[in-house]
Amino acid sequence: MRRLPKFLSRAALAAAATLWLAGGAAAQTPLPSDITDALAKAGVPPQAVAMVVAPLPPPPGAVSRAPEPANPSGERNAAPAPQPLPPPRLAWQPDVPMNPASVTKLFTTYMALDQLGPGYFWKTRVSVQGFVKDGTLQGNLLVKGSGDPKLVVERLQDLINAIRARGIRDINGDIVLDDGIFRLPPHDAAAFDDDPLRPYNAGPDGLLVNFGALVFKFQPDAGGRTARVVTEPPVAGIEVTPEVPLAKGCGDWRGRLGADFSDPLNIRFTGRYGAACGERDWAIAYPDAGHFAERVFEGMWRASGGGLSGRVRTQRGAPPGQPWVTGLSLPLAQIIA
């Protein structure tokens, strides 16, 4: 596959950082005519746009300076101060607050296509630490993630089916999840907009299951009295209010449910559900993100008829065992489509 020049890749990332950091730091300049023409053609008023185009900062340690004169005392001269950057080439409404746009993902997507290629697959590798006899694994089952960004319920079910199809029905041991492919700092789900339960606030993970999201499905019964509450994916060790009474209308159906997510193991709905809403889904970023994959894997394994004498636990850098099955992600081109 033909790849783009490396310097363009680096320039794209640097430009992203510059645009991110430089906003609000410059006096306004008029928009060039080609940009105003493009905005007019798209039906976008100039007042709805903010942009900054600025020179790239020099790489760390590459401060340009004149040759250092000799020092008779032999002492080291003090390092000169970095030179200020030239003014931005374009600064249109740099200080006007705007709703955040999905711009950063354009650069990460570009880098993924350039460095990995559109046909790249992530691999979730499953191995066994022990031996299999009469359908029972005497030992641990190891599931090692590689950062698959779209390991959703359907594909995790395919992986479980493949494990069972190769002859493991029960596990006399533990299921060990290894998400250690990334070295990540602690993630604060509330840092962006102080709403940590929004699914888009789930953090990255080397074994990210279902985008880190738990979905509650509200299904009114035919009798018109209650609505069933169904969770997807199935999760082990979590209690959820199984049904809620119905009320007239719909309106702010989430607010009327009286949801309590304060205890990740005991999720309550103490209000009512609008009968006129029909079936609705409510997705949240699971509050105890560090144990979400464990609970989902155990819930889906048991729901598939699998036995487990031990528990599901996370061990980063777990020693691999005998390869058993490998789950492939969708190709990169399909994931970003």
At which residue positions do the language-model features occur?
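N-terminal secretory signal peptides that target proteins for export/translocation
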Residues: M1-F7
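Bacterial N-terminal signal peptides
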Residues: R10-G24
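Short, low-complexity intrinsically disordered segments enriched in A/P/G/S/L with frequent Arg
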Residues: A16, A62-G74, A78-Q83
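Conserved serine DD-peptidase/penicillin-binding transpeptidase domain
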Residues: Q28-A42, M98, D114-A337
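Short N-terminal amphipathic alpha-helix/helix-capping patch enriched in small hydrophobics
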Residues: L31, I35, Q47-V49, S102-V103, ...
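A short, well-structured edge-of-sheet supersecondary motif
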Residues: L39-S64, P80-W92
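A common structural microfeature
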Residues: A48-A50, D95-P97, V103, K123, ...
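Short active-site loop at a secondary-structure junction
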Residues: A91-M111, I336
